[in-house]
Amino acid sequence: GIYLGVLLAFIWYLVPGRNRVFLAYPGRGGVVLAGAAVLAGVVDFALAYAGSALAGGNEVRFVISLLAGWGGWILYAGCATALRWGWTDERKVPSGHFAGSLVLLMVPGLAFVSPAPWGARVLSYGMMAGAVVLYAALNYLPLALLLHGRRTRPLIKAAIAAALVALALIEIRWGYGVYAAVRRALT
């Protein structure tokens, strides 16, 4: 229910005619972004499933992985709400969640394609570190913009900051599970 609810809420923000305050993309841009949101949701679901499988298939870990995948979209929808109701002066909040998910989806597989064990370690760990940095920068940058908005209300800033901390803890826990699984596979 949460999965579908967030997806529908996000699409609602992006349908033509409702997105001018959100991303300043008129007309067909809303349709394109809605399609990207759906595709990103599928990628996030696959990413969460793969992460839970690597971590042992535990249902609790799967839920944690799913929350980590959808956390960015949930916060992003919150940013859209802040923009819509005039709680911040930002007019454009970009998101790299889709690109970040694709990058992270490829990282665990890197450990199995390198021809040499030492090469696999360097490649997988190096790419994983780079992907995490890229993912964090692209996903948290929009929230940072809202935090620094001159008209952003203090209560909204506090809520965003708390959500950032919670999301970071969830994603660190998920990332460590994937890291441990890849390390076990390499050794």
What are these regions (language model features)?
Residues 3-187:
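Secretory/periplasmic and organellar redox-cofactor proteins
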